[in-house]
Amino acid sequence: VQLSVAEDARYRPFTTEALASELADATKGETGRGAIVSADGRRLAASLDAGKVIATPYQIEDPGAAAAALAETLGDAAGSAGEIREKLAGANEGATGGYSVVAEGVEPERAREVSKLGLTGISVTPDEVRTYPNGPLAGQLIGYLGTDQAYGGVEARYDEILKGGQDVELTLDTAVQRELEVALTEAAEEYDGKSALGLVMRVEDGAIVALAHTPGYDNNQFAEAPEEVKRNRILTDPYEPGSTFKPFTMAAALEEGVVSEQDTFMVADSMPVADVVIQDSEAHAPEVLTPGGILQHSRNVGTIQVAQSLGGERLVENIKRFGFGEETGVDLWGENAGIVPPFEEWSGSSIGNIPIGQGLTVTPLQLASGFASLANGGLQVTPHVTSNADTREPGRRVISEKTSSIVRGMLQTVVDEGTGHFARIPGYTVAGKTGTAQKVDPETGFYGDEYVTSFIGFAPAHDPKYLALIAVDEPQKALWGEVVAAPAFQNVMGFTLGYYNVPPDREGTKNDDPPPDPVLAPDAKKEDSIR
C-alpha cells in the first residue's frame, strides 16, 4: 500500500523540517540493511541514507513545470526533464496505488531540496543506497545488492540476516586481501595469463582470510562488469589439479600402509598404462626414489607406481575421504562438487591419470580444504568466510597424525630442495607443491596446449598456521607452476606470516642455487579422451 501526505499546509513541516531526521534514521533502525564488515573492522558493504522521490500523477497540475523543476534539482539522479515528464504523465503500469517512482537513492541534501520545492503531487520518502566503500576489493566474495534482490557472495547468502539489520562479520582481513589481489594481478600480467585466483586459509579451522580473482570488478559498477568476472570461480569452477593432487595419492598409500617413507622405487621417465604412455615432465635417466623424492621432483611415473601398489579402489576411497567429489560446506552459494569417477567407471588408463591429478576435477576451494587436512594433523575443516559460521569444533579424522607429519616433511623437501624452491620464505620452513595441469580442449575432448599453473603450500611446515593457493590460468610466457605461481605464493605467505606475528622457525633460509629449469619431455601420446 502506498501512502502519501495530503497536500495541506498543516502537514508541510513534516515533509520539510522533519525529513532530515527521517532520512538520518532510515538505515539505523531494525529495518535498515546490515553492513558487511571485515575481520579488521572495515565496512565492505554499507547502506547510506537517501531519499526516494515519488509522484502521484493525478495530483500534478502542471507536469511540464514540475518536471523542469525536478530535473534541475535532481541532476543526473532522475534523468532529463523529458524523461521525468513521462514519469509524471501517468502511474506505473499495474501499480494499484496510482503512483510513479521518479528517482531512488537520492542524496539526502537533494532530497531535502525536492521537498522544499513544495510541488503538489510530489513526495519524498526515506530510502537507502547500498555502497561498497573499498571498490573492487573482494568483489566476487561480497556480492551485490540490486533493486529487487541480492546477487552472489555474502550479500545473497546472508540476505535474510542483512535485511533484518544485523551486520555480518567476515573472516577476511583487508590487509591480506589487498596483498593477495596485488600478487595475482602481477603474476597474471607478468606471464600474460588469462586470469588468476587465490586464497589464504587458516589451517586449523578453514577460516578464509583472503579470497580473490583477477580480473575483478567493482560492485559500485556492477551493471557494467562482464558477467564472466562476477563468478566466484574458487568454488564454482572445477578443474584438473595436476601435480598439486599428488600429495593426496601419497597420503593415501601411506595411510593404508602399502608404502613407507623409506621404500624405494625405480623410476623411469615414461611408462605404458593400458593404451596410454605416461611421461614425466622432464627427460631423465632411471632413478631410485623414495616417496618423498617422488614428490620432491614431481615424478608422474613414480606417483603412478605408488598408486598401483595401493590399487584404484582404495585410492578412490581415500580421495573421497578428503572431501573430493562433494561440496565442502562453505557458507556461500553456488559451490560445485567436482567429479571423482567411481572405480566401477574407470578405464584401463585411469590408474595412470587420476593419481597425478588428471581425469578428475576439483575446485580450488576443495584443494585448499584437502591441503588443510594434510597440514593440521589430519582433520577435516569446513571452509568459511564469516565469523557467523566460525567453529572451533574439530572435524572428522581424514588421515592419522603420523601420516600428516610424514607428508608435511615431504612437502617441505619440495620447497627446500625440489620444484618449489621459489616459494622459500626467509626465517620460515615452508611446505608445498607445484602444479602444471593440462587443460582439456572443450571442442575436441582431448588435452590441448593450455595449462593451469599453480602452487599451494603452508607455513611453518611443522606447525602450520596458514595455507595459500595461487593459480594462473593459461600463462603464455612461462609454463611451470614453480616459475609462475610460487613467487606469488612467497609474497602472499610471507606477508601473512608477518602480519599475524607468526614466530619464525628457521634462521634465514636455504639460499642454494635453485635447480635448473626442467627440460620438457616429448608430449605423451593420449589415445583416449578425458571425460
Question: What residue spans do the PLM features occupy?
Answer:
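Periplasmic/cell-envelope proteins involved in peptidoglycan metabolism and beta-lactam response
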Residues: 1-222, 313-323, 471-473, 478-510, ...
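Beta-lactam-recognizing serine transpeptidase/beta-lactamase-like catalytic domain environment
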Residues: 198, 202-243, 248-474, 481, ...
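A short, charged, Gly/Pro-tolerant segment at domain boundaries
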Residues: 514-515
